[in-house]
């Protein structure tokens, strides 16, 4: 049973429900469409956890990792949970829960540093930086084992993962840099932990 992967997916889904539907300041106007589909960043949790260079410089360093708990819109949360389940289960079957969690958190942290202080991203949220880190570790394990089918991941799941990976790079310059820095962080964590 992939303990980290399933627990993390449950956590980000729980945070998504709280932030998008329940914990919204009364002073904010959020439409039904924003709540159900396109998303918004007006919730209390988003304000407390999103990536922000200014707030990190004021000592709120948890934002380097906590932003990975946030998602804007239904497509964002569904695609990230799907990708996390596919790649996370595969990596966790080889490395175990603790090393998988360290790879995810390390990649998110490294990407957060890059996006906040090099790229100068104003605000950011999403689990994809850690997911791209796990994809990097997945590729490293595949090379080490000599095959992409080293885990219980079926071929169709690998196709979905490939679409997620390529599609995520096409969403714009900022998103591409987040994903590339997450992948680079995953490579670094993979070299350290494998």
Label the predicted regions.
Residues 1-194:
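A detector for small-residue-rich transmembrane helices and their helix-helix packing motifs
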